[in-house]
């Protein structure tokens, strides 16, 4: 059977007729020269010849095509020159000076000029090939699809494209175009590569959260997040992690190791991501930009917090009074008005506050400096807002107006407290008896009743 096939090919070569459609063999796509032609090639062309022949050989092996004669490949791998090249393909110049490829046996030729990439080339067996210089799509089993220009290295050293380049590009393109469907059916080719051949992008979707990945390995790595498996355990505190890298980062908390150092200010960090975030302070980089107003932020969390201003969304709701807030920290601060929690203590006088900002404002009292002075009465203030609020007393200006009753106020706080009369809102609740109030001072006064009752009860018990 094999002898018959080889005999048929030899007959086709001698007659110059095209082979019937069937399985492609290595000699169908081999680029061959006579001994004289081989000697006329410069070292760069010979190196290109070896690369092209070996690449075509690998492509055919991948396709599972029978390769009966491997002697020429063996010589090429050893970088030895082929002994006798039976087929003859000449690169000659025609009458008008343009280069062309000519088969000695058949007499067929094709002009290789500026428009050669748009003309068909026929080799000595009659195979029609599309000649062009675009990058070729090649495939190898078990590896990703990659782009490879068969003559990239050669073109880097030559200013013009040689006829040999045009032939090699054409043959390889022919393999891909003709055997595209065979590639799709090839059992060892991964699904994403088959999809690429069809001209489609292949995607792996996580069934848990719908996130999409182009590579299966990325999906597998991502899915660890959803699994309960956390094989990496900290021997100090017992905390477990899904990845070893997370355990390594966590371990630095116990060791105090901070291997990442800022070259600007010498500050050290236990994570590279923290260092990168810190360095934006020095560079002024603000990569996270708001599409609505153009304001930029150093961190993504800053942008997320800012975006709520544009949407008007207030997702954080107080379970006590039903009031909504844009930010979680605002809700946390508000909830202390119901619980009477005051975690911030002044080290000077021991007074406690529910908010850090209140403590900061209070601590100014202990400092002697009051740089903001009223020109009318000489009263001085620690901060400019205090002076501005004070000046309204002298001017009589009351810029804050109630939309319900048109009453005006000198401070926004007074307006806010007043508006609760119209809304009926009473956000301040006594934990002892459940009574509610519309202003915090009213609640404070009320609590003294319970404090007095407790004192009286204590005296009676004594």
From Swiss-Prot:
List locations, semicolon-separated. Nucleus
Q: Tell me one Pfam family matched here.
A: zf-C2H2
Q: Does the keyword Ribonucleoprotein apply?
A: no
Primary location class: nucleus
- What's a single GO MF annotation on this record? RNA polymerase II cis-regulatory region sequence-specific DNA binding
SMART domains, per this entry? Answer: KRAB, ZnF_C2H2
User: What residue stretches are annotated with the KRAB domain?
Assistant: 24-95
Q: Where is this cross-link: Glycyl lysine isopeptide (Lys-Gly) (interchain with G-Cter in SUMO2)?
A: 119, 122, 194
Q: Which GO terms describe its cellular component?
A: nucleus
Zn finger region (C2H2-type): 204-226, 232-254, 260-282, 288-310, 316-338, 344-366, 372-394, 400-422, 428-450
Keywords recorded for this protein, A-Z = DNA-binding, Isopeptide bond, Metal-binding, Nucleus, Repeat, Transcription, Transcription regulation, Ubl conjugation, Zinc, Zinc-finger
SUPFAM superfamilies hit by this protein: beta-beta-alpha zinc fingers, KRAB domain (Kruppel-associated box)
Q: Which InterPro entries has this protein been placed in?
A: KRAB, KRAB_dom_sf, Znf_C2H2_sf, Znf_C2H2_type
Give the GO terms filed under biological process for this record.
Answer: regulation of transcription by RNA polymerase II
Identify its protein family. Answer: Belongs to the krueppel C2H2-type zinc-finger protein family.
Main function: May be involved in transcriptional regulation.
Q: What is this protein identified as?
A: Zinc finger protein 610
Q: Specify the species.
A: Homo sapiens
Q: What is the lineage of its organism?
A: Eukaryota, Metazoa, Chordata, Craniata, Vertebrata
From the UniProt record, report the name of the gene that encodes this protein: ZNF610
